Swiss-Prot record:
Intracellular or extracellular location(s): Cell membrane
Any one Gene Ontology cellular component term annotated for this protein: plasma membrane
Main location: membrane
Lipid bilayer topology: Multi-pass membrane protein
Keywords (A to Z) from UniProt: Cell membrane, Membrane, Transmembrane, Transmembrane helix
Protein name in the entry: Uncharacterized protein YmzD
Annotated organism of origin: Bacillus subtilis (strain 168)
Pfam families: YrvL (PF14184)
Amino acid sequence: MNQKEQNEHSKDFNLRSKLIGIVSITFIAAIALAVIFGGFFFGMKGLFSILGITYASNQTLALFILACFAVGLIIDPLTKIISIILAKSLSLKKTALFAFILYFISNLITICFADYFMQSIYIPDVLLVVISAFMAIIELAFDNQPNREAA
């Protein structure tokens, strides 16, 4: 085998290995996204069945979750910015209260917006408030802002 044939063979092998690498990484990323979405889907399905929320089909539930993600992509960065500004200007107790109110309102807007445009899902108003408050408590518990001494 001469040098030219070796170079062509190594280019072919190099292209093949790159293609296998790209396909493998894409496949792993798709599996990870499917597992994450499946967790959300079955979590929401269980929560909806516990709370008695009715929906027309599994596709409707999947669209509701995607709508919540889409609205959340717009609202959550604004919420984080306001939360950081409040954390710098208020004491710890006031910050926690305002952060809870801010998270509650942003969750309520997100769920109400998705619920409004999805006619095939019915969530009673009381449950909208309960779910938003529960999600706000969870967000507040997992908020990664460093705790500082109360002023």
